[in-house]
Every structure is written in C-alpha cells, then in structure tokens.
Amino acid sequence: FRRNPIIGTKFTIAISSAKGGVGKSTFASNLALALKKMDLNVGLLDADIYGPSLPKLFSINEKPESDGQKLKPILKYGIQCMSIGFLTEEQTPMIWRGPMVISAIKTFTQKVLWENLDFLIVDMPPGTGDTQLTFAQEINMDGVIIISTPQEIALQDVKRGIRMFDKLKVKILGLIDNMSHFIGDDGKKYAIFGEG
C-alpha cells in the first residue's frame, strides 16, 4: 500500500474497537485532552460516519468554515476538531454505502486544514469495515490503540480487529480493558462484566 501522511500532522493515532459501546469515543476524547494538557498541539477526528459522537462529547453545535478549498477544524478546549456530525443535522441518518463513506474519510484526511499538529487522534467507528480499511491502506498511521470490555463476545471481536491491523501492518500500541471493574463503597473490587 502507498500510505500518505495527513498534511499538518506529525503523528496519527487511531482509536479502534471491534464492538460499539465500549468507551472508545470517550477514551479518544480524554486522550486528546490529556495530550493538550501536556502543551502539545492536538487534533481529534471523529471518523465514525454512522454514529458521530464528538459534537455531543465536546458540546459543539457550530459548522466548520471553509477557506474555499479546505474545511477549517473547529477549535474547542484548544483542540482542532472535525466530525461528520458538524456537517449534518443531529437527527439525520447517514444512509451511505461504502464509496460515500470512503469519500467522506478522504475529505477529512485530505481536505481539512489541520495546522501544526503533534498528534491527530482518530476516533474510528466500531468494527472492521470500509473506514478501517481506508485508513489502514491509504493513511500513514503511526499506530492504533484498541478498546475493549472484558465480556467474551467483545474479546472475540477484538481478536479479529487485531488480526486485521496485523495483516495491514498497522502497529498496535496498546489494548485497553475498559469497564473491567469498579470499587464499591465497601472498598471491594467488583468485576461486573467478568474477568477479561
């Protein structure tokens, strides 16, 4: 594959999960905020075309401006942000086939004016479909962090996701076992979803 860097970025890190509802978008947002707190220039790209969450997570209601050729990311908390959710109405379903999704991803990676980013954090959609393949084959990603929960069914899907990224030669930077337990008022640890 001929992978191209995203112009205006030094490092591109994808946050991925094979299943929805595991905390991937929350982790991606918190990672972006943590990197910003370290005085780094950070961008956050919500690549979940069918279920964008960045507008809600960052309370962004405005539309991005354009310089005539490229979209300008919306700046929130000092982070450059872009999402399909900024370009559509909240209640509008995205009834798109693969080629339209790929076109949207290419717009976000080639036609957004990312400026002097140390890190671009990409919040991927759940699964192993067109979006993941497009990013892995066409974008120079520095690595992926995979988010899961301890349930057996989620872990089976994670294994598939790991195999996909391995085949596409994308470095796996880490695996987060999210929602693995909580500490109750009694000080005891409870693994409500089982042990992963």
Segments predicted by a language model, with ranges:
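Residue-level signature of catalytic and energy-coupling elements of molecular machines
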Residues: 9, 20, 46, 54, ...
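Conserved lysine of the Walker
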Residues: 24
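Phosphate-binding loop that captures ATP/GTP phosphates
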Residues: 41-96, 102, 109-110
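Conserved catalytic-core segment of NTP-binding enzymes
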Residues: 118-119, 125-196
